[in-house]
UniProtKB/Swiss-Prot annotation:
Domain of life of the source: Eukaryota
Biased composition (Polar residues): 831-849, 886-898
Family statement: Belongs to the TRAFAC class myosin-kinesin ATPase superfamily. Kinesin family. KIN-14 subfamily.
Pfam families from the UniProt entry: CH, Kinesin
Natural source organism: Oryza sativa subsp. japonica
Name this protein carries in UniProt: Kinesin-like protein KIN-14A
Stretches of the chain forming a coiled coil according to its record: 242-293, 656-692
Biased composition (Basic and acidic residues): 697-709
Binding site for ATP: 413-420
Annotated region (Disordered), positions in chain: 697-743, 824-858, 882-954
An MF annotation (GO) of this entry: microtubule binding
GO BP annotations listed: microtubule-based movement; microtubule-based process
Record key words, sorted: ATP-binding, Coiled coil, Microtubule, Motor protein, Nucleotide-binding
GO CC aspect terms: microtubule; microtubule cytoskeleton
Amino acid sequence: MAAEPRRVSFRDGRLASRKAEEAALRRHQAATWLESVIGPFGLSRCPSEQEFVAAVRNGIVLCKAINKIQPGAVPKVVANASCDSQPSTAFQYFENIRNFLVAVQELKLPCFEASDLEKDNIDAGSVGKIVDCVISLKSYHEWRQRGGSYGHLKHLKSPLATRSASHVQSEYVCSGSSSTPKRLDLVETDTERQPNQNVGPNCQEAMERLQKVILDCMISCKENLDNDSLKKDPYKLVGTILSRQLEKEQSSNSQVENRRRLLQAQESELLELKSMFQEVKIDFRTLKTQFQDDIIKLGDNVQGLSKAALGYNQAVKENKSLYNLLQELRGNIRVFCRIRPLINSESISSIEHIGNDGSIMVCDPLKPQTTRKIFQFNKIFGPTTTQDEVYKETQYLIRSVMDGYNVCIFAYGQTGSGKTHTMCGPSGGLSSQDLGISYMALNDLFKTSTSREDVKYDIHVQMVEIYNEQVRDLLNEDTSNIRTSSNGLLNLPDAKKCPVQSPSDVINLMLLGEKHRASSPTAMNHRSSRSHSILTVHVNGKDMSGNVTRSSLHLVDLAGSERVDRSEATGDRLKEAQHINKSLSCLGDVITALAQKNSHIPYRNSKLTQLLQSSLGGNAKTLMFAHISPEADSYVETLSTLKFAQRASCVELGTAHANKESNEIRELKEQVENLKRALAAKELEKSSFKLKENTVVRERAKQVPERTPPRPRRLSLENTGIGKGSIPDRKGPKSPLSVTKLNRDHATIHDSIDGFNHHIMHQGSVMQMSATSSEDPVREETEKIITTVDTVPFCGLHPDAYISSKQSGLDTLLRTPCRSRNLNLEVGQTDEPSSSAKLEKMTSSNATKKGSHLRKSIQSSIGKLIHGSERRNVQHLGQATPAKIANSTNNDVPSSITPDLRLRRRQSLTGLPPPPSTMSRRSSLGGKSDIGSDKRGAKTPPPVNSAAKAKRWL
C-alpha cells in the first residue's frame, strides 16, 4: 500500500513535466508565428507564460495579426509603443481586446476571455487558452494560404488531446496505482494552499483541479477498458476486427461505386454542357453578327433620321425666319400672349389647351355648353414661363434699336393680369431672375454698345405717365408743363431726358419712376397701376465715318381695364377707372381702324393714342403683350383681351426703315435747310415790299374813278394785261360767245399772228405804235398805277435768250389797259398798196364785232403760256411817257429785220422784260416810230382805216 502513493506521485510529476514541455512548445510556435506575421515586437523565441501574456495584454499584437489574416477585421487599433509588462489602460483593454475577440468569434475560432489577461490571475489554463487561440489563427492562416481545400479545419485546444491511447495505457501499467491516493493528495494540497489564498481564486483553482480529477478518471477508465479487451479471446477479437474492417471496405467500395456513377453522370452532363456551350457559342457568334448588322442598319437609319430631323429643323428655322421677314415687310404688330399663374390652386382654369404653334383654346368653365374659342398669336407663354424666357423671345427686336430702328413694346390686359410684372418685374426686389423687360432691355443695350467699339452711342431715358388724361413726368418733381408735340408723335419736348451710362443708373431711374407712378390697391389687385407708364429710351449712334443713327425704344405699361362692380372702385379710384377704360377704348378704336385700313384713324381721341401714333402708324417695329387671367370669373375679360390682341395682329404698319444718315446726306440736308431759310427770308422781304406796293396801288386806284374815263382805243397786240374794265361797247352789251367760238377765235388769232410774221419777213414792213400825248392826265395816272402790276416771265424761254434780250436792250414792258392809251397800228411803206387796204378793211369789219371777245381769247391763250408758280412782282425801272417815246423814236427810216424779231414779239405778248426804255414799243417790234409825223391830237379819235389796217396786220 505504501508503494501506490509513490507510483501515483511519480506519474503525476511526469505528466506535469510533459504538459509543461508541450505548453512551452506551443508558446514557442505562437510567438514565432506572431513574429513572422507582424514582425519583431520584443518577445523571445521561448517566452514564459508571464512574458507571453505581457506581450499580448494590450491587444495591439493580436489585432495586427488578425488584420493580416483577415484585412479589416479590426477597423481601429489603439496603438501603444510600450511592450513591457506594465498594465494597459482601460481604454486599450476594452477596445483592442474586445475588437479582437469579436473578430475571432466571427471566424468561428476558439477564443479566450478578457479576464485571462489579468496580471494577478496568470495560470497554465488561462495561458493555454490564449496560446490555443493564437495557434488556431495560425492554422486558419495556413488553411487560407492553401486555398481552403483538403478537408475541414481542425483545432487542437490542449496538449492532452494529442496523447495516444497506448501511451496513456503504458503510463497506467507502469504506475499501477488507483486514484484514491491522488485524490487525497489533491485534497491535501488544496488544504495546504487554502489559508494562503482568497476566496475568489480558491474557487477557480478548485474548478481547475476538479477538471484534472475528471480527466484522470477518464484516462483510468480507458485503461481499464483496454485491459478488459486484452483479457478476451484474441481470435474472436481478430475476427471481430476483420469483420468490421470488411464491412468498412464494403461500405467504402459501395461508396466508391456510387461516387463513380455520380462521376460518370457528371461527366455525361459535362459533355452535354460542352455541346450546349458550343451551340451557345455558335449562336452567340451568330447573334453578334446580327447585332453588328442591326447596329449598322440602325446607325444608317439614325443617320437618315438625324439628317431628316436636321433638315426639318433647318426648314422650321427658315420658315420662322421667312415668317419674321414677311412680318417685318408687312409691318404687322407682333402679338405675344402671357398667362398669369393661378392665385388659388383650387380655382378652375379657363385655358384648355396651349399649342406649340402659338394657338390657345379657352372655354368658360362655368358654362361648359359654350363654344370653345381658338386664337392664334406669334407666341404663347404659359404660367410657368420665367422672365428670362420671355425676354429671349424679344431680344432680337430690342437689339434692332442699336441698328437705327424704332421699337415699341406695350403690355395690354385687364387689371391684375401681370402687365407690370412683365415690364418692370416684381415690386419686392430686383433679383437677376425676376428683372422685367425694361431692365433687361437696357442692360442688353449697354452690352451691345460696349461690344461695338467703332460706334459711339449716347443713351437717354424718359419716363412719363398718363394719369386722368394728363401727361406727367415721372423723373421730375415738377410735372405741370408737360405737353406733347404738335405732330402727335411720341415726342415730349418738356419731359426730362436723363443720360444713363450704366445699368445701375437705369435701376435708379426705374425706382424713381416707380416711386412717382400712381398706384393704389383695389378689390382685384393689391398694387393696381392707375396710370399708363411710358418709358422712352433714345439711342443716338455715330460711327468712325460720321454716319449717324437715331432710334428710340418705347416700353409702355398700360393700366388694366377693370369692371367697377368687381374692383369696387369709388371716389378717385372710380374716376381713374373711367379715364383708363376710356383711353383703352380709344386704343381699341385705333386698332380696329388700322385693321380695317380706314382712311381716318382717330389718334387724337386720347392722349394715349396720340403718344402711340408713331408706333401704331409710323416707322416702328411694334410688339404687344396680351396678358390674361386664367380664373373662371375673369373669362369675359380674358375673351375681350384675346379678341383685341387678334385684331392687333392683323394691323399692317408697313416695312420699318432704319434711321441712318450718312455724313454726305446730312451735309446736303443742312445745305438745303440753309437755302430754305435764306429763301424764306427773301420771300419775306419780297412780300413786305409787295405789301407796300399794293398799298400804293389801292390808294391810287381809289382816285381813278373820280377822273374822266379815257376814250376807247384800239386793241394793242403788245398789251395782254386787260381785265374787265376794257373798252366798253358803244352799241350796248352783247351776248357772250360759246366756247367753240372762243376757241375758233383763239385759233384765228394765232394764224393771223403767224401770217403777220410771215408777211413781215417777206415784205420788210415796219410796225409802228402811236402813243398818246402826255397832256392827258388820266392816262398818265393810269400808267403810273399799271407799273405796279405783276409781270411774269415766260417759263419756256431759254436763259440764254433772256440774257441776250437783256444785252440787246430789252426792258420791262408796261402792261397798260386799252382805255388808258390810244394805240394805232400802221403798216409801213410797202410795194403793194392793196395789202394795206385789205388789212384796214378786215380790221374795221371785226373791231366793232369781236373786240371784247378777241381780247378775252388773247388773254386766255397767253395765260396758258405762263407758269403760275413762277410769277413774281417785277417793277418797271422807269415809266416811259408818250412824250419820251416820241422823242426817242423819231427815226423815219425803216429798220432791218433782225433774227430775234419773233422772240421780242413773243416777249411783248407774254409780258417778258422788254428792251431798255430808250427804245419805243414800236421800235421793239421791228417797225419805225411815227410819233413825230403824227398830226393828230392827244384826244383825236383814230381814223376809220386804222381798224382795217390793224385787222390786216392781224
